[in-house]
């Protein structure tokens, strides 16, 4: 008799614990149901990358001097620089330049240390291909100008949450011309710039006035 009552008590306790756990799980689910959607209907909607987004690398063949600094600073020695030495001019002549984006980690070291600024990071992130060998971009493919999300008429560009105007939580319906929350990198640099020396300017003006008076 006591064994049967113990089994009933254990079963009731387990049922109460299960109901409590279900209630906790559903409370989290119902709480998220009240929130606005944060998903993007890709590819009809695309997020606008940030100003310093590290996407596909853009390469300018005419600026490259084949110094191979990008190869030395790359953590995996990825860029392939094909050049020959011109005996007449005693300078390197670049033949081909390629980067395999299937291996690239988009760290940006090559862009940062390039002495001629022939490399730059773009906002292009759609590099998917059916063949991994197609991800090996030569200098012609690297020289193609990137396509911006905001200029594509078939896509609705959406801002990321950190770049929405103050008080907005849903990027849908927010026009692109509305000011974003915070400042742009160029505006931050302007605020960090040292102020002009007003005393030196006034001193120069007073000196010029004195010279004019003496004349």
From Swiss-Prot:
NDH-1 is composed of at least 11 different subunits. It holds the Pfam family Fer4_7. [4Fe-4S] cluster 1 binds at residues 64, 67, 70, 114. It comes from Parasynechococcus marenigrum (strain WH8102). Residues 166-215 are annotated as: Disordered. Residues 55-84, 95-124 form the 4Fe-4S ferredoxin-type domain. Residues 203-215 have a biased composition (Polar residues). GO terms for cellular component: plasma membrane-derived thylakoid membrane. Keywords: 4Fe-4S, Iron, Iron-sulfur, Membrane, Metal-binding, NAD, NADP, Plastoquinone, Quinone, Repeat, Thylakoid, Translocase. [4Fe-4S] cluster 2 binds at residues 74, 104, 107, 110. Residues 169-180 have a biased composition (Basic and acidic residues). One of its GO terms (biological process) is photosynthesis, light reaction. It is found in: Cellular thylakoid membrane. Its cofactor is [4Fe-4S] cluster. GO terms for molecular function: 4 iron, 4 sulfur cluster binding; iron ion binding; NADH dehydrogenase (ubiquinone) activity; quinone binding. This is NAD(P)H-quinone oxidoreductase subunit I. It catalyses: a plastoquinone + NADH + (n+1) H(+)(in) = a plastoquinol + NAD(+) + n H(+)(out); a plastoquinone + NADPH + (n+1) H(+)(in) = a plastoquinol + NADP(+) + n H(+)(out). InterPro entries: 4Fe4S_Fe-S-bd (IPR017896), 4Fe4S_Fe_S_CS (IPR017900), NADH_quinone_OxRdtase_chainI (IPR010226), NDHI (IPR004497). The keyword Membrane applies. Disulfide bonds: none annotated. It is an enzyme of class 7 (translocase). Binds 2 [4Fe-4S] clusters per subunit. Its EC number is 7.1.1.-. Belongs to the complex I 23 kDa subunit family. It is a peripheral membrane protein. NDH-1 shuttles electrons from an unknown electron donor, via FMN and iron-sulfur (Fe-S) centers, to quinones in the respiratory and/or the photosynthetic chain. The immediate electron acceptor for the enzyme in this species is believed to be plastoquinone. Couples the redox reaction to proton translocation, and thus conserves the redox energy in a proton gradient. Its main location: membrane.
């Amino acid at each position: 008799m006591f064994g049967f009552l113990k089994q009933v008590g254990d079963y009731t306790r387990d049922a109460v614990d299960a109901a409590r756990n279900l209630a906790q799980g559903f409370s989290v689910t119902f709480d998220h149901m009240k929130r606005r959607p944060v998903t993007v209907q890709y590819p009809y909607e695309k997020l606008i990358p940030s100003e310093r987004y590290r996407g596909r690398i853009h390469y300018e063949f005419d600026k490259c001097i084949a110094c191979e600094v990008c190869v030395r600073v790359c953590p995996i020695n990825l860029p392939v620089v094909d050049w020959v030495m011109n005996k007449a001019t005693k300078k390197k002549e670049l033949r081909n330049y390629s980067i395999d984006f299937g291996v690239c980690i988009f760290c940006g070291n090559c862009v940062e240390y390039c002495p001629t600024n022939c490399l730059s990071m773009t906002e292009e992130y759609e590099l998917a291909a059916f063949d991994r060998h197609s991800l090996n971009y030569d200098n012609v493919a690297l020289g193609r100008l990137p396509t911006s999300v905001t200029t594509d008429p078939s896509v609705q560009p959406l801002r990321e949450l950190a770049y929405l105007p103050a008080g907005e939580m849903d990027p849908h319906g927010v026009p692109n011309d509305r000011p974003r929350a915070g400042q742009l990198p160029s505006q931050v640099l302007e605020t960090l710039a040292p102020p002009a020396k007003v005393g030196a300017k006034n001193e120069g003006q007073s000196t010029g006035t004195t010279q004019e008076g003496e004349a």
